From Swiss-Prot:
Coiled coil: none
SUPFAM superfamilies in the record: PRTase-like (SSF53271)
Name of the protein in question: Xanthine phosphoribosyltransferase
Enzyme class: transferase
Reactions mediated catalytically: XMP + diphosphate = xanthine + 5-phospho-alpha-D-ribose 1-diphosphate
Residue positions binding 5-phospho-alpha-D-ribose 1-diphosphate: 128-132
GO cellular component: cytoplasm
PANTHER family reported in the protein's UniProt record: HYPOXANTHINE/GUANINE PHOSPHORIBOSYLTRANSFERASE, XANTHINE PHOSPHORIBOSYLTRANSFERASE
Entry keywords, A to Z: Cytoplasm, Glycosyltransferase, Purine salvage, Transferase
Pathway recorded for this protein: Purine metabolism; XMP biosynthesis via salvage pathway; XMP from xanthine: step 1/1
Native source species: Lactobacillus johnsonii (strain CNCM I-12250 / La1 / NCC 533)
Record-listed E.C. numbers: 2.4.2.22
Family in the record: Belongs to the purine/pyrimidine phosphoribosyltransferase family. Xpt subfamily.
Length: 192
């Protein structure tokens, strides 16, 4: 998605440890117009999949997730990183390691929001090692839901997550595919 790649070039910052900081439009401050375009692109890519729900993970998956769900005309469910007191004990749990924050999280979704009738589109902000996506796939599996596809805003192709998702038989669409951060510059797949 050219618009997204241009925005990453303009406002993204490569940090130590192969981290891309895009907090001016996605991971802290959110650009709703850009996220609407992200949602439209996910709709275009997955509209033939009979999606019943979008599943994402808090917090940075919510903006692209809600826009994709809005465009597809379906609800969005987000996995929580902490179980609030209002959540009952009927939940699906999965362990997720965050490479950015260097912490283990337990994510959860209340069981009443996912079922074997669901055809899920999993959406996330980044796909690097694939830990968040693996956790959401685990939750979908616990619910006996069908995963129609995985959509990510940014895939860091050199960190193995994309390969893992595809090797496990899931349809994957990434709106911006990064090949490397050579010389602290973002290089997209397919560039010379």
């Amino acid at each position: 998605m050219k618009l997204l790649e241009e925005r990453i070039r303009k406002d993204g910052e490569v940090l130590d440890g192969n981290v891309l900081k895009i907090n001016s439009f996605l991971n802290h401050q959110v650009d709703p117009q850009l996220m609407m375009e992200v949602g439209k692109e996910f709709k275009r890519l997955f509209e033939n999949e009979k999606i019943t729900k979008v599943l994402t993970c808090e917090a940075s998956g919510i903006a692209p997730g809600i826009m994709a769900a809005y465009q597809l005309g379906v609800p969005m469910v987000f996995a929580r990183k902490k179980k609030p007191s209002t959540l009952n004990d009927a939940v699906y749990w999965a362990d997720v390691f965050s490479y950015t924050k260097k912490v283990n999280n337990k994510i959860c979704v209340e069981k009443k929001f996912l079922s074997s009738d669901d055809h899920l589109l999993i959406i996330d902000d980044f796909l690097a090692h694939g830990e968040a996506v693996k956790g959401m796939l685990n939750i979908a599996d616990q619910a006996n839901a069908t995963v129609a596809g995985v959509g990510v805003v940014v895939a860091k192709e050199f960190q193995g997550g994309s390969e893992w998702v595809k090797d496990h038989g899931y349809s994957l669409e990434a709106l911006a595919r990064i090949s490397d951060f050579e010389n602290n510059q973002v290089h997209f797949v397919g560039e010379e």
